[in-house]
Structure formats: C-alpha cells, structure tokens
Amino acid sequence: MVETLRHLVFVHDSWFRRCVLGLTEPFTAMGLGPRFLMDQENGLDPSARLSLDEVLAVRDRQASEVETWLAEVTPDQLARIAPVPDDDRWPPYAKGRAVRQCLGTVLDEEWAHHGFCKRDLDKLSRQDSSQDS
C-alpha cells in the first residue's frame, strides 16, 4: 500500500503541480514514477524506506492543495491549455492538453489506486482472519 501511495505522490507532482499549475519545482523524492523513468534525473528515490505515516502526511498536504485549487477554479480555467513547463521532465505528452484533461488524469489515477488499496486491504484482512482461525 505504501508503494501505491508513493506512486500517487508522483502523479500529484507530475500531473497536478507541473501540468495543471505549471510549476517547475522538483518532484517529491519519495514519489514512485513509471519504471522506465530515470529516477535520479527526476530527483526520485525509489529505494527510500518510508512508513505509511510519512507517506500519508505528504498525501494529506497534496489533497489539501487540490481541494483549495478546486474551490477556486473556473470553467474557463479548466478549458485553457495546461501550462506544462517547457522542459524535458515528465510527462512529455501532456503539452497541448487542456487543464481539465490533466486534472482528469490525476482523478483517474486516484480512483484506480483507491481500488488497488482496497483490494490490498481486503487481502490483508482475509490473511489476518485465516491466521486467527
């Protein structure tokens, strides 16, 4: 589950902060990108051993950032071309997409990984139940 949440840290940094907001700040080191992405070049540390609480603290801050932005965004802003920084960082294929499309990627990833976490928690719960028997 920690790895799934670490991937969402990366999704937030790449698709929300870089594509929706147009920020050029480095990725959060704890994030996990796709396997083909050059981790060190992007400031990522896939070997980091993090607790669930550490990752949840970052995810809470990220969720607050999205909630604050959503409370103020207008339909016109969602329709604009995303201000993706003009550099070679991830995701290169976001250029030319609307802000709404980039936000959609964030929300799709959140929903899909929610399902993965639920699946993993159910599996752990079943394992605990079988060990108690």
Regions found by a protein language model. Give the residues of each.
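Acidic/histidine-rich alpha-helical segments that form the ligand environment
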Residues: 40-79
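Short, contiguous alpha-helical
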Residues: 1-45, 81-133
